[in-house]
Amino acid sequence: MEQRNHVSSRIFFVLLLFAVFTALTITRPVIAQPATHDPSEQHARKTQPDRQQREPALLAHRGLVRHCPENTLPAFAAAVELGLSIELDVYQTSDKQLVVIHDKTIDRTTNGSGEVTKMTLAEIRQLDAGSWFHSRYTGLKVPTLEEAFQLIRQRQRKPVTIALNMKVISPGIEANIARLVEKYNLLDQLFVFGQPEDSSQRFKQANPELRTTEVKIYDSEHFSRALKNPLADCLWVGFIPSRDEMAHARTLGKQVWLSLHIGAKRVDIWDQARASQMDGICTNWPLECRLHWRKQDSNLANGVNQR
């Protein structure tokens, strides 16, 4: 058994190195044609078996952040190459361009200074968004949301979920995002979260099929109320709902995503979320979570006591 687990670990690290090496090739925007609507493709996505139906999807928080600079094309490429879903953050610049970055200012993750919403795209694109993490990423640019969508469409082997975190609600941002989501045919893969209710209403006005989310749900009472919210296609929760609560959410067509101890390597939380059959987990440790589950499955198949 030790030898088998050792082999699993070696496979894990080989895959990781491959993904990061692939990500390092992302030095300029990926050029990809916007996808056209294909009803047969959409039907195939809805009917084909999907791991998400058997265990929670793993949302790589800001991409594969432990191995690449957060919210950059290499971080997203590495995640998608390994079949992970992605959580990312979006702002609108002063010239109404959509960029992917977490903080309100560019100070922490670039060599510049200033508020994202008060800068033009050209000003932001002059900055280095990679060397703060490691010298091999020197010259990396803050990506646009369109570049992120292009990359995901090009690199995904099967559809991955995109969780789009709304950081600041600038005028017109909902319609701009909706147009881009439609352009790349990502309505069935994406949901937006973090926005207030009036912003969710504007998203629905822009496109009724764009999934919006209620956040900051920390207990069963709030969970029950959120299930009745017509603007809550998804629930972003900070606790583990029971299996019965999850079953009820599914009957209502709601998805439930866990945002609890994102930065911590908490196998107990991962296991509880899996047992409850949650739709997904947002974490900085998606590969370690997947490996933990695969080892559990292997041990169970071989009759190994996991206590």
Protein language model features and the residues they cover:
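Metal-dependent phosphodiesterase/phospholipase catalytic core, i.e.
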Residues: 38-42, 102-210, 237-240, 252
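Conserved, mostly hydrophobic/aromatic
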Residues: 61, 79, 89, 124, ...
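Hydrophobic faces of well-ordered beta-strands that scaffold small-molecule active sites
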Residues: 58-60, 86-88, 162-164, 190-192, ...
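Long, acidic (Asp/Glu-rich), low-complexity accessory segments flanking structured domains
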Residues: 33-66, 130, 137-140
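C-terminal active-site rim and adjoining tail of enzyme catalytic domains
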Residues: 38, 43, 137, 213-307
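Catalytic domains of carbohydrate-active enzymes, especially glycoside hydrolases
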Residues: 75-92, 229-235
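Bacterial N-terminal signal peptides
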Residues: 13-25
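N-terminal secretory signal peptides that target proteins for export/translocation
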Residues: 1-9
